[in-house]
């Protein structure tokens, strides 16, 4: 994978699609429009931006030997995963603690709560199956639920202690067709048939806001709560909100109300249902944890302490990179490493391995070993450890590296950019070998490309075509800018406005015009420069 090249291809493909779709009749309008959206600094796209971080700290052998769970992962957990296992364990009478997981992408947030909840379900059903939903996991999108369902199925199926003893159901509004949706657990699926879910009542319920709401309201779904609603010993002990940060504003209020209704319906006292939230990484402010805890308390209705927030722990850059040489080849060789139109991923990687690693056949593991000895890689990690940067920003911040500064002085900025792109491609290619024989990425590399909505484009009401983003309107500019329209049949374009029968002029308020257009009001007009006064 070449993330930077992929970002460019995505950008170019979108631009070409827009050009094929918006074929303006007027050449001056077409030229102005495409200059506007392709502008490097203020066009349709922002980026690409790069994020690069060292791996997470793993638990020690001694810590792995003392995980307070019987159902444990087959891999050495990260330090933050071990912390979650300890907080959520129910071993030896320990009460699971409210938990907020704020680790980064690729950190195994799901595994943080997956093994503790499987451990709980295993012990409930170890000798005789205890009826009732024991865990609810709520997702903001069905696609996320479906993806996690497959991972959950594989984990249960591959553990003989869980297979045929612990069940899970996907309750997201589908599953009515008995032929299409599975009624039993499998190696790559959980129970998805709605009737089977209601009949068997799975231990773990993967759902969304809408279906959990229906599950509490509708009589036909009341069988879901067998083992909880009519007994003092409640089976339900965990509720998980995936992507907790997405539940903001009115949606957050709705979810908070739903959780309180769930507790009321099942007569669950405060403190019995353990809340778990997964979230994006939090800010570095002194009150960031306190703010997150307050937010979680409002949503779950349970008490969260700052020590309940689990953050990531990454290997220090100097501990991860043992510099032997700077690693930057001669500028003339770097110029040979530019990505060509006829390159495949393999030919490109082989070429940069040849010039950067002096081994065109380097395996991902060998490449990783070499990169961890380069001073330029260490400096790149230091530059990117606190945030995301554009290629230009990375280039400017690498000036402290003597060889990189010399490369810039002796050649040009283009050569420096090629060098950065080569490094990122090598990092994406490289792997690290674990003690158990598995390989993982050498470092955590992300490339982000931001795209604006075309609906945010306004056109100034004037003869010469000129466009502006809605968010960039200058209050001191007396010119009027309105939403634009384009006709796919004839290529005509112009402005959208609104005028009531009682008005003597067209409306210039963008929000009013957009609302009228969306609601298909009859007072909406399409205007252009060819209209007669």
Regions found by a protein language model. Give the residues of each.
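Active-site cavity-forming subdomains of large catalytic enzyme subunits
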Residues: 243
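Helicase motor interdomain insertion/brace
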Residues: 1-89, 104-107, 114-138, 149-155, ...
